[in-house]
């Protein structure tokens, strides 16, 4: 039985970065949820109606990126993100500056013609899309790429800042970080100090760098005998 929680999670992951019906159906299958096409369309429409900020954000990113590309050297912005295109670097590279100041690079920006596919099969039609060079081949650049990279990159920068604060604080030496996994920090602690460590992790995880002031942030903590993947955001590994 499909729960609203499951569908809501899949919808957020599939649609938040510009995905539509196809992306929702594909991600739902990954979570072993079967959706009919009509049902998926209804979910997409409902999600976008409930999240009007999303399409405004996507279009703002794309407009800023294209405006920067049109005039090399000009800096454009979309909220806290900035873009600049250098035609004399890496074969023509678009840069996106994250709120932290870190730059993401899209080198050798080019238009290309690609086959239109439906249900994984070519239709015989062609379309033109913007693409950039990757380690292996080229990848499409569209508002979904920019949105995903901006959100994931900013989240990673916030997590790195948290890790640095914990690891450089002598008072927290009793809870060494053993690893990070996506949006999780895993510490090794004694069982006697588990509650103390969880409170500290929560405090540190909810402390934003100055450049991230005002961004929404949530945290969940858990202590366990050994690491396991679950629905929590932070874990303290008790020993």
Residue spans for each PLM region:
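Conserved catalytic core of nucleotide polymerization and phosphodiester-bond processing enzymes
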Residues: 1-239
């Amino acid at each position: 039985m499909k729960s609203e929680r499951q569908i809501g999670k899949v919808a957020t992951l599939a649609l938040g970065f510009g995905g539509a019906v196809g992306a929702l159906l594909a991600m739902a299958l990954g979570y072993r949820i079967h959706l009919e096409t009509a049902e998926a369309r209804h979910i997409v429409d409902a999600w976008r109606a409930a999240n009007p900020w999303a399409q405004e954000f996507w279009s703002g990113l794309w407009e800023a990126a294209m405006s920067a590309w049109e005039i090399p050297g000009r800096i454009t912005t979309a909220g806290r993100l900035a873009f600049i295109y250098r035609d004399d670097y890496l074969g023509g590279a678009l840069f996106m500056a994250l709120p932290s100041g870190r730059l993401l690079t899209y080198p050798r920006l080019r238009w290309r013609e690609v086959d239109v596919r439906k249900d994984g099969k070519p239709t015989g039609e062609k379309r033109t899309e913007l693409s950039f060079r990757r380690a292996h081949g080229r990848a499409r650049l569209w508002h979904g790429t920019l949105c995903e990279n901006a959100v994931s990159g900013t989240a990673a920068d916030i997590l790195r800042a948290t890790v640095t604060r914990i690891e450089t604080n002598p008072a927290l030496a009793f809870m060494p970080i053993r690893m990070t996994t996506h949006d999780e920090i895993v510490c090794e602690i004694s069982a006697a100090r588990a509650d103390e460590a969880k409170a500290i992790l929560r405090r540190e995880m909810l402390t934003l760098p100055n450049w991230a002031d005002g961004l929404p942030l949530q945290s969940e903590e858990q202590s366990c005998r050994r690491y396991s993947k679950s629905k929590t955001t932070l874990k303290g590994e008790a020993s």
